[in-house]
Amino acid sequence: MKKIFKAVLNTVPRPLLIRLSYVARPILAAALQGNKFTDPIDGKSFRTFLPYGYGKQRNNVLSPSTLSLERHRLLWLYLKNETDFFTAPKKVLHFAPEQAFYKVFRNLKNLEYTTTDLNSPLADVKADICNLPFANDSYDVILCNHVLEHIPDDKRAMQELYRVLKPGGFGIFQIPQDLNREVTFEDNSITDAKARAEIFGQYDHVRVYGHDYFEKLRDIGFKVSEVDYTKTIAPELVERYCLAPGEIIPICYK
């Protein structure tokens, strides 16, 4: 199964993957029913989660029902437990909307919810993150997760995120990050898909962020809280929800 998943991820275009997943999800969820692991997003339990990864596959990380990964479940728990995201009126901009969140967020009556991406079939607005068609100070919350590692000019993208965020608002900009690396590594001469996968971890990534990612955001003007949220969750729940211990959520305030 791991080989099949890896082949599909690396050969099927992402917009088509999203469409195909609507057929596959109910079948996978029914086949893997159990009570060992739980997806906190929809509360469903399974005997195992699925493997996932464009390069090296991680075992037991992809929820069959919502298609959430470790980072999605962690973010869900943070938003649910530590913010008023689900209750207070908010204008939200969501980049590259994840299927795990899309329908839930779309149906929240308290949110004025807009999605954006260049290619996703779930995007309301087709837009370049480096040249957004939104006015200054437009959004209370911006979600932009696992996007910046794809963007050659990530500084410009960060400036645009800062521009459209309202003063007093917050953004969450998760990225794949090597916290053992002090300085971000990027090399614009690496354009081959196989080389990028080997060096950056995925065929369409252009860098590996280090611990200096947080300073990059601060240099733009954000006030950044580096939240290690798994430390606040009981170890048995970290295991049951299949979270990644030590994963940092960057909460960015304007």
Which functions belong to the PLM regions below?
Residues K2-P133, T232-Y253:
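Conserved N-terminal segment of class I S-adenosyl-L-methionine
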Residues K3, P15, V23-F37, P152-Y162, ...:
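S-adenosyl-L-methionine-dependent methyltransferase catalytic module, highlighting the catalytic core
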Residues F95, Y139-L143:
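Hydrophobic beta-strand segment of the Class I
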Residues H146-H150:
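Short catalytic micro-motifs in class I SAM-dependent methyltransferases
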